[in-house]
């Protein structure tokens, strides 16, 4: 018989989409059930990274957006008495071909020693460029932790 699942840290990658907000809800619920903490990582996508590098997108505006989303996620965790923290990661690099949202999520999971990952999978039809819907399959295939795709 296998040991019961033990969860200390739940990782929830987000991109600011409605789907990632729903993933935070699930992540907080799982963390509360297992008396675990939650870590929300805001993954910045390729289009935004290229815009920052070209000077078309303000790095400060991206930081503000990521911070506002993280604040909402952390407030939700606080309401559920779940310890929470957050970070931001670029999910793309023009100089490293192996850097993409899926690898960033798994690298973050390793760095924070996450036991469980909740990843948004379905993007809205109007948001075909959502960063995380492209990464979900990669995470599902290669994560060493249990993954809930929502």
Feature annotation, model-predicted:
Residues 23, 50-53, 96-99, 129-130:
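Short, well-ordered secondary-structure micro-motifs
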Residues 56-59, 103, 136:
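Short, hinge-like loop/turn segments at secondary-structure boundaries
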Residues 78-117, 125-127, 145:
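Structural beta-alpha unit
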Residues 116-138:
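Glycine-rich, Arg-bearing micro-motifs that act as flexible, cationic patches
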Residues 34, 80, 135, 142-144:
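Short, structured coil segments at secondary-structure junctions
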Residues 5-54:
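Small/aliphatic-rich secondary-structure junction motif
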Residues 57-71:
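A short acidic, glycine-rich active-site loop
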Residues 146-150:
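Short hydrophobic/aromatic patches at helix-to-coil boundaries
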């Amino acid at each position: 018989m296998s040991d019961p699942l033990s969860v200390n840290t739940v990782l929830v990658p987000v991109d600011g989409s409605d789907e990632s907000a729903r993933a935070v809800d699930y992540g907080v619920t799982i963390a509360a059930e297992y008396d675990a903490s939650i870590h929300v990582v805001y993954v910045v996508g390729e289009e935004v990274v290229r815009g920052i590098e070209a000077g078309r997108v303000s790095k400060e505006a991206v930081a503000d957006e990521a911070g506002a989303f993280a604040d909402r996620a952390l407030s939700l965790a606080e309401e559920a008495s779940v310890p929470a923290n957050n970070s931001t990661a670029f999910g793309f690099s023009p100089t490293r071909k192996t850097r993409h949202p899926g690898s960033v999520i798994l690298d973050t999971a390793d760095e924070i020693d996450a036991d469980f990952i909740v990843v948004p999978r379905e993007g809205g039809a109007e948001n075909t460029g959502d960063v995380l819907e492209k990464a979900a399959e990669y995470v599902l295939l290669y994560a060493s932790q249990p993954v809930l795709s929502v």
